[in-house]
A protein has these predicted regions:
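Short helix/loop capping segments that flank catalytic or ligand/cofactor-binding pockets
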Residues: 95-98, 213, 228, 250
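Iron-sulfur-cluster electron-transfer modules
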Residues: 1-125, 132-133, 144-148, 157, ...
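Active-site gating/interface segments in enzymes
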Residues: 158, 167-168, 233-281
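Short glycine/threonine-rich loop-to-helix capping motif typified by GTGT followed
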Residues: 135-143, 250-258, 330
Length: 352
């Protein structure tokens, strides 16, 4: 299946163009907190059958970081369908490079995992996707890894979810494409060739308080504080975020907060100025940037009035929590955060 380049260019997508600030973490080597012992008897990658590949992914408990689903389950559903395999190394949020960094640093393992996944699917059609708009990158993005082509995804943030929606709309036939994470491919190679289970995850440790930003391969359950100690703090952060700066969550309990499979980044940030929120001025910027075409402030106003039905009619369930509305708001209102709180109340059976 050939995908049109218009899907990847993203010329007409809504959203916000963000300064990526991925350096210097992206160009540095991936730090392993607990280096693995070398495998004495690696299996021949070319001799593995599709069923053996799936069994290895199953026994290693590999979870795809793109959607949190077991990799074996995703591959088995599309097995033998000739599906085009798309590898997610997009990382379109600032600071975060926990997919692109390992893909580049461990490219032989990543390429090996992609070939294994493609064999399980019964396809030779595979492509790695990276974000186009990384102006500060100090590392050259190659045209391919191990012969597998790399395509650049353009467009404003959130480029990835908008690309997925366009793919789903244009190529709606079952088995036409499958999106898997670059890190899941690394773990698939290790599981199938070396017999290693997934006990680690890749995390970007960065922010303006981090002395040595880099991507770290951390054991699951590692306290967040240990990651910050490893990379060093130059000053006391005013907030620590787990995940990207737009979609992540703030934490204060650094000793008891543990690294999970869903932890893409630990960002230590110091804000030197206090932000105050003001009354909505009705500028309409939140509506202009919303990738779903919603009117976020109007939805929030209806929720504040307790008008659940009006909020539903305005499309509250279509909100993807990309937080573009909060980012662009000149009044500094936490539009996306408030909408999320109301949605959680509504799911719990409470009225807004």
């Amino acid at each position: 299946m050939q995908l049109t380049d218009k899907i990847f260019k993203g010329l007409y997508r809504r959203g916000v163009m963000l300064e990526q600030m991925k350096e210097p973490a992206l160009s540095r080597t991936v730090k392993q907190m607990e280096p693995a012992e070398p495998c004495e008897n690696p299996r021949d990658i070319d001799a593995l059958s599709p069923e053996e590949i799936l069994r290895a992914a199953e026994e290693a408990d590999i979870v795809d970081e793109t959607d949190g689903r077991p990799l074996a389950e995703k591959l088995r559903e599309a097995m033998g369908s000739g599906t085009m395999l798309l590898i997610d190394a997009i990382d379109d949020e600032p600071y975060v490079s926990s997919q692109m960094g390992p893909m580049l640093a461990l490219r032989d393992q990543c390429a090996g995992g992609i070939r294994l996944a493609a064999r399980a699917l019964g396809t030779t059609d595979a492509t790695v996707l990276v974000y186009r708009h990384i102006s500060d990158s100090e590392v050259a993005i190659p045209r391919n890894i191990g012969g597998i082509p790399i395509k650049r995804v353009g467009g404003k943030y959130p480029a990835q979810c908008q690309m997925e929606e366009e793919l789903a709309e244009r190529y709606s036939g079952k088995g036409s494409w499958l999106l898997c994470g670059a890190c899941a491919m690394i773990h698939l190679y290790r599981a199938a060739v070396e017999g290693r289970p997934q006990t680690t995850t890749f995390v970007t440790v960065a922010g303006n308080c981090v002395g040595f930003p880099r991507n770290v391969e951390a054991p699951l359950g590692t306290p967040v504080l240990e990651l910050l100690k490893l990379c060093g703090l130059t000053e006391r952060p005013t907030r620590v975020i787990l995940g990207g700066p737009l979609t992540g969550t703030a934490t204060e309990d650094l000793r008891n907060e543990k690294v999970e499979l869903s932890t893409t980044a630990v960002l230590a940030i110091r804000d030197d100025k206090h932000e105050y929120s003001y009354t909505c001025i009705g500028c309409g910027r939140c509506t202009a940037v919303c990738p779903q075409g919603l009117n976020p402030m109007r939805i929030l106003q209806e929720l504040r009035r307790g008008n659940r039905r009006a909020a539903e009619e305005l499309g509250i369930e279509d909100c993807t929590q990309c937080t573009c509305c909060s980012y662009i708001c000149p009044s500094r209102q936490s539009v996306a955060g408030e909408i999320l709180l109301y949605r959680q109340k509504m799911k719990g059976g409470e009225e807004p």
